[in-house]
């Protein structure tokens, strides 16, 4: 796992960052392919997602809405647990094989369809993305 130290500046013995090294040299940019205002709590029966999980919702949010974006990247590309939105107002709320859904919050977002959302990516995420033939890579 020397790559984790070299590319992410992680001290594998202590779990801490190495101060003299950069921790964020990789970025994942995912394109917004759909943007919609939706209820925070879905109406109707809630079934299992592709991973067999049933999402739970706070009934106190019934009647509230937020903006959701669908991104052009999914579970076949990366596990959402390996990425973190750079915008701390954005929350990853779900994923399917070919898309990730993010919640942009209750206020009309500055984002539009076609915009790229940047994400921090961890070591396992970088391994997955760099190995994928379906993800364009760009060295800056």
Task: Name every feature range the model reports, one short phrase each.
Residues 1-140:
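Active-site anion/phosphate-binding pocket segments in diverse small-molecule metabolic enzymes
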């Amino acid at each position: 796992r020397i790559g984790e130290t070299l590319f992410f500046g992680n001290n594998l013995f202590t779990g801490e960052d190495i101060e003299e090294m950069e921790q964020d040299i990789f970025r994942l940019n995912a394109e917004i392919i759909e943007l919609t205002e939706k209820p925070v709590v879905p109406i109707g029966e809630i079934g299992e997602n592709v991973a067999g999980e049933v999402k739970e919702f706070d009934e106190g949010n019934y009647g509230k809405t937020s903006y959701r974006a669908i991104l052009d990247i999914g579970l076949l590309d990366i596990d959402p647990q390996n990425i973190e939105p750079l915008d701390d107002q954005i929350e990853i709320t779900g994923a399917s094989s070919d898309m990730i859904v993010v919640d942009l919050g209750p206020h009309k977002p500055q984002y539009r369809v076609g915009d790229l959302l940047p994400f921090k990516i961890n070591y396992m995420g970088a391994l997955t993305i760099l190995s994928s033939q379906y993800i364009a890579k760009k060295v800056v």
